[in-house]
Swiss-Prot record:
Function description: Binds together with bS18 to 16S ribosomal RNA.
Protein name: Small ribosomal subunit protein bS6
Claim: Nucleotide-binding is one of the keywords in the record: no
Family indicated by similarity: Belongs to the bacterial ribosomal protein bS6 family.
Family annotation (SUPFAM superfamilies): Ribosomal protein S6
Listed GO MF terms: small ribosomal subunit rRNA binding; structural constituent of ribosome
UniProt organism field: Desulfotalea psychrophila (strain LSv54 / DSM 12343)
Gene Ontology biological process terms from the UniProt entry: translation
Keywords: Ribonucleoprotein, Ribosomal protein, RNA-binding, rRNA-binding, Selenocysteine
Origin: domain of life: Bacteria
Cellular component GO terms, alphabetical: cytoplasm; ribonucleoprotein complex; ribosome
Length: 159
């Protein structure tokens, strides 16, 4: 088995159901040929294409990292060429030979990286909330000081 990654771009005008069908069919090609999907990520939104393709300036990106056979890659690319929903695709071979232990390690590494990213995002959000609270507190203090100054009577001195 070898490790590959494929990114493919789907038409932005497709329904969510059709997008999911294309993704499921693509993943099924890999799994049916005794492959393993290490990581896949649909973009979830249309993004601008750097180059216009088939008169479309946007697309729905899907990234897939997997271990499979060359036959599975050939079949997947054959279907991409036939499928009108796929605007572009590209497959890159990452490793010629990968063992089951290396696959599990890659899956674990990706899970750890995702957990670290999630933790960092939560920490950043907490820090942002803390900053907002401090700013609100300072604004409230200044408003209170201004109110006290306005409420205090001004003594006029006679000369």
């Amino acid at each position: 088995m070898r490790r590959d990654e494929t990114i493919y771009i789907l038409r932005p005008t497709m329904s969510e159901e059709h997008i999911n069908t294309v993704i499921e069919n693509t993943n099924k090609i890999i799994l049916d040929d005794a492959g393993t999907i290490i990581f896949y990520e649909p973009s979830g939104a249309u993004k601008s294409l750097l180059t216009u393709s088939r008169k479309s300036s946007q697309g729905y990106y899907v990234y897939c990292d997997y271990a499979g056979t060359p036959a599975a890659v050939s079949e997947m690319e054959r279907r991409f060429r036939i499928e009108d929903a796929v605007l572009k695709y590209m497959t890159v071979k990452l490793s010629e030979d990968i063992s089951a232990e290396e696959i599990q390690q890659a899956i674990g590494d990706i899970a750890a990286r995702e957990a670290a990213v999630k933790e960092a995002a939560e920490a950043e959000e907490a820090a942002n909330e803390e900053v907002v609270e401090k700013v609100v507190e300072k604004v409230a203090e200044k408003a209170a000081e201004k109110t006290v100054e306005e409420a205090a009577p001004v003594k006029e001195t006679e000369e």
